[in-house]
Amino acid sequence: TKNVKDLKLEWSYNLGSSRGVESTPIVIDGVMYVTAPWSIVHAVDARTGEKLWTYDPEVPRSYGEKGCCDVGNRGVAVSNGLVYFGAFDGRLIALDAKTGERVWETDTIENRDKPYTITGAPRVFKDKVIIGNGGAEYGVRGYITAYDADTGEEAWRWYTVPGNPDEPFENDAMKMAAETWDPSGKYWEAGGGGTVWDSMVF
């Protein structure tokens, strides 16, 4: 606390939006990566505040109505020279950390008739990128999906709540969970919720 009086603004950076910012910045090798509303990624020199590059995934503005709580984004994951982030419209995108050029993109949404979104930051573990989704407020079924970090190919998907009990269950855990849900409520038609819209730990 002795040096608090010496703190001063070193630099500021305009993210280009009057909307709220929910992203947690990540600094790697002197570069700060931060996301703005509409899932726009900024790379900034952490020492000077100079913009290095930006990437706009061009989420259709009409897609904003599918979110409950604005079009925020909680940040990126960085690993092995790639920056990973989820776009609000459900795409998972990998960028070159130095140039901001897109390396790959994949659609994480299993059913485009449902109002799925992504607002959370992905996680990287070994050679997998893991991401959840949002949309429980409007009746979707939650799941977590892992993708190959180099190619974007889907590796596995794990649902957080059971689906239609008249259809085969994905695993024994979903069968066990379904036995605790009252089928008379037809929860699978409402989606079931359970979206993993923010931080994950493992």
Locate each region found by the language model.
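A short, polar/proline- and glycine-enriched secondary-structure boundary/capping micro-motif
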Residues: D45, T54, G64-E65, D96, ...
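Short loop/turn segments that connect beta-strands within beta-propeller blades
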Residues: D45-T48, E58, D96-T99, D148-T151
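Repeat-blade elements of multi-bladed beta-propeller folds
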Residues: G20-I40, E65-R91, T117-R141, G185-F202
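Internal hydrophobic scaffold segments of catalytic domains
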Residues: N133-A136, V140-G163
